[in-house]
A protein has these predicted regions:
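Structured catalytic-domain cores with a bias toward divalent-metal coordination
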Residues: 1-194
């Protein structure tokens, strides 16, 4: 789930309803993502004209639901119900939905995302699952080159939530295979890479 840091308090309930594992927060990650394209102009206007007291309008977020490989009907139904429950909480629709079954996840700076790269070509074997908290030094995946018998284990360099893994299982050197969202800024400038 992606959002402006200033909007995160309003999005925490949706994150809980959807069982999101991490909120990635940035004002301008580059690439004009949906949430920033809708919300950032209001933030910029309020900073440009502070005396006008322009509210931070257009609450927008980008939510990734399960990735391309997850087309499970039960998951899709749960996500749809979570979105409807959030809309009802906001008074935008009528109806009764249960409170979130999960606690809201932590919002992390998008700048704290570590990209774990393939050190060489080979078959990828993931050792951890998306959504898990990992510590710096934890083994995240192995790359096994069947031609040379070279095996490399790639570890997290930061503590945080493992929030994305590459769906393809053959590594190419220099391409990311996993992403960990940490609490401390690691990157600056253009943060979107896909």
């Amino acid at each position: 789930m992606y959002a402006l840091p200033q909007h995160w308090p309003q999005w925490r309930s949706l994150a809980a309803h959807l069982n999101v594992k991490v909120g990635l927060l940035a004002e301008d990650s580059g690439g004009s993502s949906f949430d920033e394209a809708c919300s950032l102009p209001w933030l910029r206007l309020s900073r440009q004209f502070p005396d006008a007291q322009i509210p931070l309008a257009c609450l927008a977020t980008t939510v990734e639901l399960g990735g391309q490989a997850n087309t499970d009907r039960d998951d899709a139904l749960a996500w749809a119900e979570g979105i409807l429950a959030f809309l009802a909480e906001q008074g935008l629709i009528t109806g009764e939905w249960p409170k979130p079954a999960n606690e809201p996840c932590e919002g992390m700076p998008f700048e704290g995302t570590e990209l774990l790269l393939a050190p060489h070509p080979g078959v990828v074997s993931f050792l951890r699952k998306p959504g898990e908290w990992v510590e710096a030094g934890d083994e995240i995946f192995e790359v096994i080159d069947p031609v040379s018998d070279r095996v490399s284990t790639v570890c997290a360099g930061t503590s945080g939530v493992l929030f994305a893994i590459e769906r393809l299982r053959y590594a190419q050197p220099g391409f990311w295979l996993a992403k960990v969202a940490g609490r401390e800024a690691l990157r600056h400038g253009r943060l979107l890479n896909d």
